Amino acid sequence: GLWYSAMTQRVGLTPNEDEYVLMGMAAYGDPDRLYYNIKDDFFNNKTRLKNNLHRGCLQWRPDLHTDQDMFDIAAATQKVYETILHTLLNFAVTYYPSNNLVLMGGCALNCSANSITYDYFKNVWIMPNPGDAGSAIGCVLARTKKFISLDDVYLGHNIQGEYPVNKIIKELISNKICGVAAGKAEFGPRAFGNRSLLADPRGIDIKDRVNVIKQRQQFRPFAPVILQEHVDNYFTGPTSSYMQFTS
């Protein structure tokens, strides 16, 4: 995770904040161009770099500076991480045989890589907020020796009133982008309807309009919302209620 944050800084983003942007950038790069450079420099030979990753790695390969270079760095970084994840999962299933896996830590927000887990385990559970906040809850439960049922992620500040379903539908079918702030806020970094920007994906320019409002890069991915019974008509791969896997 620390290394992934360092690479986030290397492509000009904010470490410990923009790792999800790096993950999105990876889809637009060549993962093979710099794969062995990154793997060899950071994990095999250059100990100095390994010991100082908390300071970032802006000094690594200053010759790489174009936009496509940044996309290629992101793609190679994602591939290296997924290679490491394969190794760890293979070790886990070999030495601790089970159908079940619980995945925690900030890296568990990497939904592109998370889908790999189903190659090794039948049942995978990831805390909706798997970073430090989710780990803190786990520590408390371990200390108190209690079990809880996490039925949803709406644990934050509550805005009183009825959820405006009909009003939202009216706005969406008019090809408008709807900002929603209702009910309890989501616990974690992702929005699930209570603090969200919602849009009808059938709009021709809807993607660009949302990006303009959010002031974000054009390559950033979107999270579709669909009823469970229709998922298999449009997507393959594991389903997720909390934006934890990709199709």
Residue ranges of model-derived segments:
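Short glycine-centered, acidic/aromatic-flanked micro-motifs in structured strand/loop junctions
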Residues: A75, G105, I126-P128
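Conserved hydrophobic/aromatic pocket- or pore-lining residues that grip, position, or stack substrates
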Residues: M7, L85, G106
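A general "terminal functional-core" signal
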Residues: V80, M104, A108-N110
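Gly-rich Lys/Arg/Thr-decorated short loops/hinges at beta-loop-alpha junctions or inter-strand turns
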Residues: G56-A76
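Flexible beta->alpha loop and helix N-cap segments adjacent to enzyme active/binding sites
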Residues: G1-N51, L109-N110, N114-S247
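Phosphate/ATP-binding catalytic cores across multiple sugar-kinase/actin-like superfamilies
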Residues: A75-L101
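Short glycine-rich phosphate-binding loop at a beta-alpha junction
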Residues: P97-G106, G179
